């Protein structure tokens, strides 16, 4: 298959500062304890209005008033996820005054009670996802086909990783694999992608926190007669509880991130698990408005704008390596971004 992977052009996606900034309005907006804490919370993740009400124990009308002030000052953005509206901090160039205001603001942590409420919200999100997968493992493959069949993106994920592995060996001046290479797939589903990738690695590991999902994947592996699956291991593990041992060369998450309670926490964990110059590859939905994805497939997020994924990656030391977009199907468009863990190069003396 001829390569369709385009290197990512960082210059065209740099944060841009508005032509006119109302610094007075920004300063006034930040100069309120509750609004300052809202911005601190939004530095961690995106939250819905009712989630922010819970975090700060504030009634919805009052909180909406504060959010309006922050948005009018240009300090926050909002996006719709089905019937819910989520807020996040606006992005500014690193050397800009608003970025300096955010940095100063973040020197003071969120109050302990608010942090505890944030953890409660993450737990609720995770339980919602876990409950769906536990109760729908037997029909999820069929329902996922209605959103995006795996055969749509698998060839591109395989190609992305093959090119990365080849360039890594070339950069290290290797003619063959000398070290043990390990792949981790998060939420392997029916294990079709895992089986397609396994031949590129010494070890291919798939993890899921749902035993019913693992059982379904194991059944599919046992019936797979076209691929060598001897080096594949399936493990019942929580992605966020894996030891931070930087032991994986490549991490793959295909149609998984939109189920995660916190995209930012996902990227933080990936950073801890990847080896130097390791690769994260996502197959993920672009933003959409089809609420049926939540009921059919248990989606928490209705896709992601590429710049949102790039911001999460950059915050956690991951650099965009390539970006692909596949043709729209069933009303959904798939993106396949890859991110490389940036490591400092030793200085030559």
Where are these regions (language model features)?
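Amphipathic alpha-helical dimerization/coiled-coil segments
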Residues: 5-9, 96-142
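Class I SAM-dependent methyltransferase SAM/SAH-binding core
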Residues: 184-241
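Conserved alpha-helix/loop element of class I SAM-dependent methyltransferases that forms part
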Residues: 148-179
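A short SAM/SAH-binding and catalytic strip from SAM-dependent methyltransferases
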Residues: 250-262
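A short acidic, Gly/Pro-enriched loop at the edge of an enzyme's catalytic core
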Residues: 240-251
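C-terminal alpha-helical "lid/dimerization" subdomain adjacent to the S-adenosyl-L-methionine
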Residues: 279-338
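A short glycine-rich, Lys/Arg-flanked "PGG" loop and its adjoining helix->strand segment in the class I
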Residues: 264-279
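N-terminal helix-turn-helix DNA-binding core of bacterial DNA-binding proteins
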Residues: 21-62, 85-92
């Amino acid at each position: 298959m001829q390569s369709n992977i385009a290197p990512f052009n960082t210059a065209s996606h740099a944060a841009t500062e508005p032509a006119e900034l109302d610094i007075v309005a920004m300063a006034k907006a930040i100069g309120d304890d509750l609004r300052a804490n809202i911005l601190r919370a939004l530095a961690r993740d995106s939250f819905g209005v009712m989630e922010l009400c819970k975090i700060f124990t504030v009634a919805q009308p009052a909180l909406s008033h504060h959010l309006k002030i922050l948005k009018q000052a240009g300090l926050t953005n909002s996006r719709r996820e089905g019937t819910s509206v989520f807020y996040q901090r606006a992005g500014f160039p690193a050397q800009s005054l608003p970025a300096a205001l955010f940095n100063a603001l973040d020197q003071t942590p969120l109050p302990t009670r608010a942090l505890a409420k944030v953890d409660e919200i993450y737990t609720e999100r995770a339980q919602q996802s876990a409950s769906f997968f536990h109760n729908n493992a037997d029909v999820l493959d069929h329902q996922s086909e209605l959103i995006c069949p795996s055969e749509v993106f698998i060839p591109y994920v395989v190609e992305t990783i093959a090119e990365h592995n080849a360039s890594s060996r070339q950069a290290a001046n290797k003619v063959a694999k000398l070290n043990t290479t390990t792949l981790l797939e998060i939420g392997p589903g029916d294990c079709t992608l895992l089986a397609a990738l396994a031949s590129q690695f010494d070890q291919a590991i798939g993890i899921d926190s749902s035993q019913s999902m693992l059982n379904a994947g194991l059944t599919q592996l046992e019936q797979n007669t076209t691929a060598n699956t001897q080096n594949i291991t399936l493990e019942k593990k929580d992605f966020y509880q894996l030891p931070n041992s930087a032991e994986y060369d490549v991490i793959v998450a295909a149609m998984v991130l939109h189920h995660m309670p916190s995209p930012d926490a996902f990227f933080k964990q990936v950073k801890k698990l990847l080896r130097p110059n390791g690769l994260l590859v996502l197959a993920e939905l672009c933003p959409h408005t089809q609420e049926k994805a939540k009921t059919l497939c248990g989606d928490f997020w209705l896709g992601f704008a590429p710049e949102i994924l790039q911001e999460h990656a950059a915050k956690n030391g991951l650099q965009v390596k390539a970006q692909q977009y596949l043709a729209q199907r069933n009303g959904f468009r798939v993106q396949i971004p890859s991110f490389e863990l940036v490591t400092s190069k030793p200085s030559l003396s």
